[in-house]
Amino acid sequence: MSELLEKAERLKTASQTLAMLSAEEKNEALEQIAQTLDRERAFILQENEKDMAQGREQGLSPALLDRLQLTNERLDQIIDGVRQVASLPDPVGEIIAEWTRPNGLRIQTVRVPLGVIGMVYEARPNVTVDAASLCLKTGNAVLLRGSTSALHSNKALVAVMKEALRTTAIPETAIELLEDTSRETAQRMFRLNNYLDVLIPRGGAGLIRSVVENATVPVLETGVGNCHIFVDESAERQMAIEIVLNAKLQRPSVCNAVETVLIHERWPYAADLLETLHARGVELRGDQRLASAYPFISEATEDDWYTEYLAPILAVKLVADVDEAIGHIRRYGTKHSEAIITENEVNVRRFFQAVDAAVLYHNASTRFTDGEQFGYGAEIGISTQKLHARGPMGLVAITTTKSLVYGTGQIRTV
């Protein structure tokens, strides 16, 4: 039996045990995971450094290396995320609706686990723990398929989590890492309908497209983040500058970083914003008017408006009004996160009604599109589709429902 099928069998069996556990049993297991990750951090960082060294040798971009790297600070955040998930209410068993029919049948809709979730992701070892903690909390088993570039890190993290589970009610086979990262095995995983209930791809456009186009297992699609900020005519100067700097520079390599800033042509502080960005080392690519007016702005191509840079590069454009900004976002956006900075409430309402995106912001950075920032604990991904879940996906997004019907002998006669 192949590694894939062997682990899929184990996961399916483990999911049946998981579905029967109490919230207390699952929370105790998550606390054990947090403690063991903390205790084994030296081993985890050592294995991560092997991936980092290989990545540098292979010429991975700074953005990819940043996503790949684990540090003590990032491990602290990962461990805190596990504990935050443990502290959240367990959605499993929640009665969503309840009613009684005229014939006396009492019907309940309750929340239940999905079953076995397949995670497909790139060089993001934090996803290994985030996904596992969310899945275990919701009674789901999880098959993790990371990238070759993060294999040492992922093996270490999964080994540590499995060690932690050995003293808990959750079987250690509820978490499995697919160590064969070949394309052929991935394609087989995408068609494992008898074992996997859903696939969740998390990564770049190529990875997501590959899963969506090749999977027969249902896909909960996450999307790339070509995020925009529209600085309206009434935007307050310092607020606008601080929001744009945060959205671009706090962590440029993530999907909720801003990639294009649209500036109202009558906003009086455009020069201040652009010069500040330039001084902070941001490469600016602008429309013809901006490229002509500022020697440090190169002229943008059509491709620039579509690009998720994941780097300190920013496309900038002057627009006549909120409607032109909305039109630009409709054409080039990826329905992820879009923001408007303005003191004009009419324009806020227009922007919120007209822009189709998972998350919309007024006077705030796009960087808040994140499960932890939304209060979900760690996130399984950020969905840009409209069915089942949209936006940062926390616990509820990886559950489904079933109906429980209580009778007293009723039979159907019509």
Swiss-Prot record:
Gene transcribed to yield this protein: proA
Entries under Pfam families matching the protein: Aldedh (PF00171)
Purpose of the protein: Catalyzes the NADPH-dependent reduction of L-glutamate 5-phosphate into L-glutamate 5-semialdehyde and phosphate. The product spontaneously undergoes cyclization to form 1-pyrroline-5-carboxylate.
Swiss-Prot/TrEMBL keywords: Amino-acid biosynthesis, Cytoplasm, NADP, Oxidoreductase, Proline biosynthesis
Presence of the UniProt keyword Amino-acid biosynthesis in the record: yes
Family: Belongs to the gamma-glutamyl phosphate reductase family.
Catalytic activity, EC: 1.2.1.41
Biological pathway: Amino-acid biosynthesis; L-proline biosynthesis; L-glutamate 5-semialdehyde from L-glutamate: step 2/2
Protein name from the UniProt record: Gamma-glutamyl phosphate reductase
GO molecular function: glutamate-5-semialdehyde dehydrogenase activity; NADP binding
InterPro entries: Ald_DH/histidinol_DH, Ald_DH_C, Ald_DH_N, Aldehyde_DH_dom, G-glutamylP_reductase_CS, Glu-5-SA_DH, GPR_dom
Main location: cytoplasm
Listed transmembrane segments: none
Catalyzed reaction equations: L-glutamate 5-semialdehyde + phosphate + NADP(+) = L-glutamyl 5-phosphate + NADPH + H(+)
A GO cellular-component term linked to this record: cytoplasm
Subcellular location, record wording: Cytoplasm
GO process terms (BP): L-proline biosynthetic process
Top enzyme category: oxidoreductase
